[in-house]
Swiss-Prot record:
Localization per Swiss-Prot or TrEMBL: Secreted
Family statement drawn from the similarity comment of this UniProt entry: Belongs to the FARP (FMRFamide related peptide) family.
Tissue: Detected in the thoracic perisympathetic organs in larvae, and the dorsal ganglionic sheath in adults (at protein level).
Source organism phylogeny: Eukaryota, Metazoa, Ecdysozoa, Arthropoda, Hexapoda
Sequence positions bearing Phenylalanine amide: F9
The protein's name: FMRFamide-13
Amino acid sequence: GPSQDFMRF
């Protein structure tokens, strides 16, 4: 996914 995949919580 994108670089902001860590924002998925």
